């Protein structure tokens, strides 16, 4: 399943993509009329939280089938052309990112590879697919992109052994880790350079892990104005998904809706000769196999 959150006619909701259509089932409406018992999550995050005791996907499947069989199925759909995409799930706790997890990316920026180079991104930096990111020209002329695979956590845990780590994954998404290279290079920490308003585009979907069985063998392609900048594969990650979860959960308790960014391959603007940073009006597309394409724009003004 591909889950998303959106705004439609001034109201926020969430849904699941309709197969072979550029549309979604509005799950707020579907559950309101066809939920089994009292199961009626108000947001996608609520659904992930309840998934620890109830099979969320199975409840979605049953409710959608009931909506289809009602003869009024179209009343429960929204067209993508009519909605504003929001971040698929707003974490209640953490947006955790691993840096220098691709050797070629570390090399292009002359960074030493460390086993753990971890930082957080402010939740206020989250934005959705097709949104416009402020150009931040008042503080930097070195705005950069980093296309990444994102892990979405599905159940709570800490000190998770590697052998059980994938049990804690609900699904995967796309992240563009927008970075102010000027601040990053001037400071000994990454939080400020990585937490700009609009600096964490996520989406357009969360793809459930059953639909992405080989997340460590998918291509990541980032384009700026249709020019290919990054063309990598998650197989190049130094620490794999189970290792990332094992390492971070030694120190941090993970909860449903937490997002973990797994690092970026080579091809960022700062690594080019000469560097090519994002400019007002630029379009950035990050595509990952079997998830989709995350598109964002840099504001003209």
UniProtKB/Swiss-Prot annotation:
Gene3D superfamilies: Fumarylacetoacetase-like, C-terminal domain (3.90.850.10). Pfam families: FAA_hydrolase. This is Uncharacterized protein SSP1806. The keyword Transmembrane does not apply. Signal peptide: none annotated. A divalent metal cation binds at residues 146, 148, 177. It comes from the Bacteria. InterPro entries: Fumarylacetoacetase-like_C, Fumarylacetoacetase_C_sf. Belongs to the FAH family. It comes from Staphylococcus saprophyticus subsp. saprophyticus (strain ATCC 15305 / DSM 20229 / NCIMB 8711 / NCTC 7292 / S-41). GO terms for molecular function: acetylpyruvate hydrolase activity; metal ion binding. Keywords: Metal-binding.
């Amino acid at each position: 399943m591909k889950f998303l959150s959106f705004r439609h006619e001034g109201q926020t909701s969430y849904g699941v993509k309709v197969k072979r259509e550029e549309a979604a089932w509005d799950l707020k409406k579907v559950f309101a009329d066809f939920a089994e018992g009292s199961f009626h999550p108000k947001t996608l995050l609520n659904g992930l939280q309840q998934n620890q005791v109830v099979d969320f996907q199975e409840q979605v499947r049953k409710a959608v089938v009931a909506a289809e069989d009602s003869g009024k199925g179209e009343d429960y759909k929204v067209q993508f052309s009519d909605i504003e995409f929001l971040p698929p799930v707003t974490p209640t706790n953490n947006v955790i990112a691993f840096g220098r997890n691709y050797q070629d990316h570390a090399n292009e920026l002359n960074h030493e590879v460390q086993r753990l180079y971890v930082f957080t991104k402010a939740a206020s930096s989250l934005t959705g697919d097709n949104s416009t990111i402020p150009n931040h020209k008042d503080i930097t002329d070195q705005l950069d992109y980093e296309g990444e695979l994102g892990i979405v956590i599905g159940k709570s845990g800490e000190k998770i052994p590697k052998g059980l780590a994938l049990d804690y994954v609900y699904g995967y998404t796309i992240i563009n880790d927008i970075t102010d290279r000027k601040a990053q290079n001037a400071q000994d920490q990454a939080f400020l350079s990585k937490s700009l308003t609009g600096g964490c585009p996520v989406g357009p979907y969360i793809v459930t892990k059953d639909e992405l069985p080989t997340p460590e063998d998918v291509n990541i392609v980032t384009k700026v104005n249709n020019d290919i900048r990054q063309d990598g594969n998650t197989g190049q990650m130094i620490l794999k998904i189970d290792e990332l979860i094992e390492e971070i959960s030694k120190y941090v308790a993970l909860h449903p809706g937490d997002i973990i960014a797994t690092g970026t391959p080579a091809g960022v603007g700062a690594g080019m000769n000469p560097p090519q940073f994002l400019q007002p009006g630029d379009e950035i597309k990050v595509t990952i196999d079997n998830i989709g394409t995350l598109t964002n724009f840099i504001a003209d003004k």
